[in-house]
């Protein structure tokens, strides 16, 4: 018989640097799982992606066991790295925070494709372009 799911928790944590301190401890503590076991497993799985923020989905079962599903970094994080900027524009349509090329946009879209609700790479590019626009990042040819 399959294990009964008691909860699903979504977190965005720095790769390889998760600690039992907030936000991890309070989010998972209520389900009674071993927080140190989660932190150790997450850090092992994400050690190669240091410097990125990696979203994780923790499925918690009734026997207090859990499974970890890693996602791709947020589109905004990937776009900031591609544009080489610290943060997006406070006024996106007025002030340009940075620029990326169409090739860089395609690379970000390909990386995010598995997490996006898009059927083709062109549709994924449009989604990522919208995120870039709302951050004040201009796309140049």
UniProtKB/Swiss-Prot annotation:
This is Large ribosomal subunit protein uL11. Belongs to the universal ribosomal protein uL11 family. Forms part of the ribosomal stalk which helps the ribosome interact with GTP-bound translation factors. Keywords: Methylation, Ribonucleoprotein, Ribosomal protein, RNA-binding, rRNA-binding. The keyword Secreted does not apply. Gene3D superfamilies: Ribosomal protein L11, C-terminal domain, Ribosomal protein L11/L12, N-terminal domain. It comes from Roseiflexus castenholzii (strain DSM 13941 / HLO8). Part of the ribosomal stalk of the 50S ribosomal subunit. Interacts with L10 and the large rRNA to form the base of the stalk. L10 forms an elongated spine to which L12 dimers bind in a sequential fashion forming a multimeric L10(L12)X complex. The keyword Glycoprotein does not apply. Transmembrane segments: none annotated. One or more lysine residues are methylated. GO terms for biological process: translation. CDD domains: Ribosomal_L11. GO terms for molecular function: large ribosomal subunit rRNA binding; structural constituent of ribosome. GO terms for cellular component: cytosolic large ribosomal subunit.
């Amino acid at each position: 018989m399959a294990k009964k799911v008691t909860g699903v928790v979504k977190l965005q944590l720095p790769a390889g640097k998760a600690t039992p301190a907030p936000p991890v401890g309070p989010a998972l503590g209520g389900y009674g799982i071993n927080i140190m076991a989660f932190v150790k497993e997450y850090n092992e799985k994400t050690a190669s992606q240091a410097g990125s923020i990696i979203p994780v989905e923790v499925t918690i079962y009734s026997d207090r066991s859990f499974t970890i599903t890693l996602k791709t970094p947020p589109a905004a994080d990937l776009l900031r790295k591609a544009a080489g900027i610290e943060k997006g524009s406070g006024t996106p349509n007025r002030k340009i925070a940075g620029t990326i090329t169409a090739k860089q946009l395609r690379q970000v879209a390909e990386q995010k494709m598995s997490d996006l609700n898009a059927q083709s790479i062109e549709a994924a590019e449009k989604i990522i372009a919208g995120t870039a626009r709302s951050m004040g990042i201009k796309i140049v040819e």
